[in-house]
Amino acid sequence: VKTLKTLEEFLGKKAFAVIPVELGGFNTLAAVDVAARRGIPIVDADGAGRAVPEVHLKVYTLDDVPLAPMVAADISAENIVLIEQTRDSQAAEKITRTLAAEWNQTVYTARRILTGKQVKTSPVPNTLSTSIRIGTLLRKALDPLRAILKETKGFLLFEGTVAEAEHETKSGFTWTTLELDGANEDRNSSFKLKAKNEFLIAHKDGKLAAIAPDIITTVNAETGRCSSAERVKKGDKLAVIGIPAPSKWRRQKGLRLWKEVMQRSGITENYAPIERLTKRKSS
C-alpha cells in the first residue's frame, strides 16, 4: 500500500485500479490485498499470464509500456526507493534484483502505469477468474489433476517421485534442478527440470518435453495442488503438467524476449510449442 501511495504522490495522480504483475503465488495475492485495502477495483488480468523469473518479462514490455517510474520497498516498508527513470525494462530488472538480494529476496513494487485504453489491450485477460475456477476444482473435483488439465487445456508430462532436488540462491534468484523417477505410465522413464525461480525447461528421457514460455508446473500427484520449485524436496510424489503460454508470448517479439532470458539462464534450446512435444493429452 505504501509503494502505491508513494507512486501516486510522485505522479500527482490517484490509481483507479490495480493489476497483478503476474499470475500465481504471492504476487497475485499482494495485488488483491492492496486493492481491497485501498477500496479500488482489481482488474481480471495480469502482466504475464503466468509466473515469470525476471521483472521486465511482462507483456507490457512487448507493448512498449515503460516499467518506470517505479517504487520499491522492503517487507517492512522502512526502506522505500523511487526509481524515476531507467534506460529500459531490463535495467529496471537489474535494479530490483539487486534490492531483492539486499532485502532477503523480497521487494514490493508499484509500477507500469497504464491508461484505460492500455488496460483493455495490453494485459493478459481473464486470468484471475480462471484462477478462481481452478481453485474451485481443487476443492471439489473428484479427480483434481484431470479437472485442472481439462480447464487449462494442459498436458500431463510426467508422474513420479523426486530422486534428486538441488536448490541454490544466488544473485537474487533461486536456481533449482530436479530429477524424477517415473511412476504409473512413466515407470520406466526419468524426468529432469530446471528452474530460475520458475521452471524453464523439462526433459523426459533426455528429450525436450517442455520449454518456456509454455508453463511448466509441478503439483501434488493426488491433490493437484501446486508445489513451487523452491519447495520441492527429495521423495515428493509429483505430477508435472504443461500449459500452452498466452498467445502474446508465442509471437516473434515475445519469443525473442524469452530467448534472451533463457540464454542468460544457461539454456540454449530453441522454443517448440508444447503440443508438438507431447501427445499425452489432458484426459
Q: What would you call each of these model-derived segments?
A:
Residues 1-16:
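Glycine-rich oxoanion-binding loops at beta->alpha junctions
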Residues 14-22, 41-43:
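A short, small-residue-rich loop immediately preceding and capping a beta-strand
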Residues 15, 103-115, 144-158, 247-253:
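Flexible, glycine/charged-enriched surface loops at secondary-structure junctions
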Residues 21-32, 49-54:
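Short glycine/serine/threonine-rich phosphate/pyrophosphate-binding segments
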Residues 37-56:
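Short, acidic/small-residue loops that bind anionic groups at enzyme active sites
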Residues 57-99:
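A structural-propensity feature for long, helix-poor, extended segments
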Residues 132-183:
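Oxyanion-binding "anion nests"
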Residues 166-283:
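C-terminal non-catalytic interaction/assembly regions of soluble proteins
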